[in-house]
Amino acid sequence: MKLSTITTICLSISGAFGTTAIALPTTVALLKNHQQQNTEKQQNPIKDIRFGLNNVQVPNTIPLHQTVVEVTNNKAIVDYKDAPQKFFLAKSALNNKLQVEFDKFLLRTGVINALNADLKEWIDQTLFIPNQSFFDLSANKLNLTLSNQSEVSLDLEFIFTNFSDKNQPLKLPFDGSVVVNANESYTYSVKATLQKLKVLTYSRADHSVGISYAIPTVSLNGKTQNDFSFNPFKSNINFAFKNVYNALNPFEAQQYLVGQGKFLNQKVNADDVKNDINNHIETQFNVAKITATLLGKAFKQFGEHKNGQPLSLLKVLSGLNNEFKQLFNYVRPGLGDFVSDLIQSSSQSSNKKTVYQLLFENKTTIIHLLQDLNISELNSVLPVVDILFEGINSAESLYQRIQSFKDLIVPALKADKQLKSLEAIILAVLDNPNTYVFDLVYQNKSILFNLLSDFLKNTANTLPFLQEQFDIVNHLFANEAIFDLFSNADFVEKIADLFLAKQKVQEVNNDGTKSTKIVDSILVATLKGLVGDQLSSITELLNIYIFENEFLNRNDSNSSVKKQQTDSLKNLFSVIGDILSETNVNKITLHAVKNNELLSLVETASTLKIKHLNVQYKVLVDKFELKNSFIKELLNFFPDTKDITPTIKKVLFESENYKTLRKKYENEGFPGYHWAKFIVPGTFNSAENTFYSAIDKTKSIRDLFADMLFGKSLESVNDSDSFIKINGSFTLKYHGDNLNLLPNYHSLITKNVGYQIVNVNFHIDARLLTAELQNTVFSNPKPVIKSPVELSKSLFEVWKTIFENSVNQILKKEYTFKDNLKFFPFKADGSSRLEFDLSKPDQRVIPFAFVDGYQFQLKKELIPNKETKKEANSSPVLKLYDAVKRNDRQYRPNHHHDDLRNYPSLKSQLELILNLGDKLKANNDFIDDTVVNALQYKTSFKSTLKVNSLGIPINLFFFTLWLKFNLEIPIDGSLTLTSVNVVFPYSLYDTSSNEFTRIVDRLNFTDTNFYLKDAFPNFWFVGF
């Protein structure tokens, strides 16, 4: 939405209710009557001086039309080398440009009438109103001249007449006063020679910069006054900047807010910090538990709803609204009530909430949320939204209030290109007081789909290093079906349609025409994106059982499969509900270990620090269970086709590795038996036939997985038995020395502010946590692949090895990384943590200001080349991790791992990732308060499928010779999660993309790599 459109509507609302805090546009029809009345009053003043009414006539006191300038990076006002086209700016960014722009404005605009209007207000507010009880006011001279639109002279002479019968004090500007005898007069003069008007700034309602002016030197009754202004707090010239704020950027503000005797040091004490840290840990834990049980209840409802009426998502959410309220009140005080009402804003809900009820009952929360979006157009409007609710006491009266402005809103919608796409939705809300949010979402899914697609496209352009992840997200939102989840249809059926069925996607051809393309289901597309090209050795296996599996990639026309999918999903949801049941989740508990130590804050002239921090909690896990039923329900998504012989043939005996091995032995003979090359072909043929004969052709791939995972037949697996039990404990610790405390800004400009602890060590010790398989013995007397091959048993042993390695290499370890511990502006009880006084210039902060020299760009090598094929270990994140670690080793050979603040390599690490702006690079304090983490979690597994003394019959003319061979198939692979992240204390502009700019305080680079080495079977003769 354009600012001009919003401002016209909202400032008109302001005018209608008599608010004068904002200069009003004179073109709005709503104000014409009001202005006419004022003009008539000025032309026909009442003459009875006994009522003390002003009879000073100032001609043509008419404000100018509003002129609002949006500052962009286009050489007109500012021209920054590495900057986005659009940005927020603090006033200091334009300090040396304001006078120039003001002079240009004066030269092109006739402002004399507006100056007269300012003079009229000054006479009223400064001379007349303070003295009206005893004095009449008239003017002998009233000469205000403007030369060349930029120079002004004054010759004003006022006469105050004391109409009382007593001597009275006459109040004069700048706290002066004189006593005037009864029925006598006093002359007051204001004089200034021709001088150039000097620019003067003031804060508008949204704290953006409004322009007033001052006269450099004025004589007030003979006393010289410098920089004199008729109205320093607003001006009828109505000149302002849209995205420039009369506030400090965070780098400027820090010197005024942090340090001995300053705001943060006065407001934050040691007890606050200790309590906030403890509450933070406990809140995060509670949020995790409530989220888990909430999901468990929802999954259970979907899973157990087998027959009858469709069970929609919104019906389930509506039934859980109390749980949602509790959860979101933890996330942000007051948010729970809004979310609870929001999920009931549907015609499907038993306790329906209309859009107007939602707005009326959650006004404050909604405004806070909109502030957090930091959209400049919205922020310019929010300060006057309160006017809309003035005198409103019900949702119905809110609807009537908005109806009174419909004639203003509708033309604005049609005139604004961006708003026009939302016209149908907005008109639906305007026309009907009984509209519901989720009904609007479903009914207007085409509109919202287009907006969402554009948003994802724009966001992807700002995050080039996450292109693969965005490809997956784009696939999810490739058509409007995502919005069907909010309909009254059965939710599980819609999940099957959306995630497990092939999708129809519209594409735009080169000639501009559209065509429909059938693409993989979202699940299969996601799995392909995650797997990539790194599992070539099992490509056939993946194709058969995953990518081409009708249960996971259904053709939309196959309704019989859809029924099976839906039933399987419901069964799966039911067992997930059991895993996340309150009984199971409550086996995980949080206990304070060290949380009551006395904290000490130390301060200097420019800092506030925690001298020593050591807060520890322990999480106890008492036999948290993952049941066999969960694994069994997952296996139901594999095809139940009997006889896996074709699969074994493709995976083992038609693989390139096997063919290479066979060809080698056919040419060279078996080692030590080169003279007997003639038996090699028959040996291999017999080996293959022996494998085939060992396969139970009445069993499916599900049964083979049961052999591997349970060690028993699928039919004998008890659903209620445990598959994995997690037991033990892990500790959480926040610690560090001399930790900086800084403000934490959460929205554009607001009095509510939090604080942050910078560069805190966060330590997780999970060495006492165990995860144990409960099926540890292979006991299936009739496996899928039986003797003499016994491949089922070998697969079972391989699975155990992989699981145990993963637990030891990933779970039972210690992890330490850095973070900024941020506390939001509101406490758990909803009260403000810290409050700025926005009337004080050093407490108005615009945290998202672009500051030239503090921007950055991603290094080009972090952006994958889409034209080249991604190979194992070649992702930019892995290269970045290696570079950061090499940098660590180069600079940090003799330092303890946790002591990061004293390392000289922090700037070097940042420069491996980013091209830093010159001021950012030079600000060592900011660099020291920046976090760089390079973390890698890796589990490797190496095992061997073994078949010993495999008897192979070799037919030799008149008799059969039985030879014995050993077969080994090595399995060697790894799973690696690599993460490099950067955390800034304040938000910076990422200008890596010319078209789309992000404002960020955190960068995350992640890479998941699953690698399976090509298996080369080893097959050798061991005797007769």
Swiss-Prot record:
Keywords: Cell membrane, Membrane, Transmembrane, Transmembrane helix. The keyword Transcription does not apply. It comes from the Bacteria. The keyword Cell membrane applies. The lineage of its organism: Bacteria, Bacillati, Mycoplasmatota, Mycoplasmoidales, Mycoplasmoidaceae. Pfam families: P116. One of its GO terms (cellular component) is plasma membrane. The chain crosses the membrane at residues 11-31, 951-971. It is found in: Cell membrane. It comes from Mycoplasma genitalium (strain ATCC 33530 / DSM 19775 / NCTC 10195 / G37) (Mycoplasmoides genitalium). It is a multi-pass membrane protein. This is Uncharacterized protein MG075.
